[in-house]
Amino acid sequence: MVPAGDQAEEAIVADAGKEEAEVRAAMGVEQDGKFSMTSLLWHGGSVWDAWFSCASNQVAQVLLTLPYSFSQLGMLSGLLLQVFYGLMGSWTAYLISVLYVEYRARKEKEGVSFKNHVIQWFEVLDGLLGPYWKAAGLAFNCTFLLFGSVIQLIACASNIYYINDRLDKRTWTYIFGACCSTTVFIPSFHNYRIWSFLGLGMTTYTAWYLAIAAAVHGQVDGVTHSGPSKMVLYFTGATNILYTFGGHAVTVEIMHAMWKPQKFKYIYLVATLYVFTLTLPSASAMYWAFGDALLTHSNAFSLLPRSGWRDAAVILMLIHQFITFGFACTPLYFVWEKAIGMHGTRSVLTRALARLPIVVPIWFLAIIFPFFGPINSAVGALLVSFTVYIIPSLSHILTYRSASARLNAAEKPPPFLPSWSGMFVVNVFVVAWVLVVGFGLGGWASVTNFIKQIDTFGLFAKCYQCPPRAHAGAPLPAPPRH
């Protein structure tokens, strides 16, 4: 007799194999092994594609705000919290992958076909736990992805300003909003193969540029490292790191794009380990060199002298933020398509036109709240806490609370934690920690800091944290207080 879990995996593999053949045929990819440029650049679904997608999506503009977080936390806390939240995020990404496999296995046993349908997290929750969980997952996930897209637009405007300051940041936001709207033409995560690969290369360059440039620059005169100095700053910085390693709100969509999604289990962990090689050296080197000056410079580029190397890093980050905007927006496009009955449409142009209304509110919110840095912490505390930490942990406990569910589970506990009780204990710890530290203390600190930005700069700020321009006979304005 074949165990239930093995049967479930075989069913998913068989269905994925059919889907791969159908997609290849539809795209004109040859079956006899001949080289195809379309397949190389556009047709992604392997384990490597998923790894590049996870790693690329995890380290976008946060590279530039992590030094700011270090100035709030101090060096030791900054390093430890990165490792802690990185491992915690890998755990909940693993839980999401397990629940996806469970949901898909159950549905395929019922004869449900997912041809021309992308499974999403709220549908997994609906199938396993019911409509109330679906509503919670839909609300938190969509709101998080909405603001995740907003953050990418804000980051584009913030970065390009360090190359061309003839236009203010608000104007740059208008321009990049129009550029990023072209992501409506990318059908699904299958088609991010070349973009994910390039995106990770771009962030790798930027991270090592920050680390090396800071080391070469050396410590500024009179540098101080007073962090952590205030509770509100400490927990604001901590929630930015919580946000950094909470990029798996698109895990289900990435898994669904794989030919063999049951192989996803440890991909996010391996991606996180690579991300550590980028975030730890760059953030610590920048904080060592500039110290407390980072408290009023949330974008690391602002403290480094202009050079060809810096301009290259800025341009590469701009391209990568376009890619990350697409990553965050694509699940929103899917939700909208399903709501208006366009999800099964094969025409790329028709789907692109149907998706455009999603870009408008993102554009508008980026203009209202241009607070690069503080907005990351607020989103991390209020949305990421639930979307990618609390809800996956609770839903895993509830899905496997009965003995029969555990017996027939499509995925058994992992080798490194081979008991259901052990998994439940870890899940309870994650829920308690994130609820108290992430949402509670982090929410208080990040919202307090966010309100200060509004009080200092106002909504619709034309040029957030721009250096003051000198005017004859006019005193320079005081720098913003944090």
Curated annotation (Swiss-Prot):
GO cellular component, as recorded: membrane; plasma membrane
InterPro entries in the cross-refs: AA_transpt_TM (IPR013057)
Disulfide pairings: none
Stretches of the chain found on the membrane's Cytoplasmic side: 1-58, 100-134, 193, 253-265, 335-355, 399-423
Top-level taxon: Eukaryota
Database matches in Pfam families: Aa_trans (PF01490)
Listed GO biological process terms: amino acid transmembrane transport; auxin-activated signaling pathway
Residue spans, topological domain Extracellular: 77-78, 156-171, 215-231, 287-313, 377, 445-482
Family of the protein in this entry: Belongs to the amino acid/polyamine transporter 2 family. Amino acid/auxin permease (AAAP) (TC 2.A.18.1) subfamily.
Purpose: Carrier protein involved in proton-driven auxin influx. May mediate the formation of auxin gradient from developing leaves (site of auxin biosynthesis) to tips.
Phylogenetic classification of the source organism: Eukaryota, Viridiplantae, Streptophyta, Embryophyta, Tracheophyta
Protein name: Auxin transporter-like protein 2
Topology in the lipid bilayer: Multi-pass membrane protein
Keyword Ligase: no
Record GO terms (molecular function): amino acid transmembrane transporter activity; symporter activity
Cytoplasm as UniProt keyword: no
Transmembrane regions: 59-76, 79-99, 135-155, 172-192, 194-214, 232-252, 266-286, 314-334, 356-376, 378-398, 424-444
Record localization: Cell membrane
Keywords in alphabetical order: Amino-acid transport, Auxin signaling pathway, Cell membrane, Membrane, Symport, Transmembrane, Transmembrane helix, Transport
Predominant location category: membrane
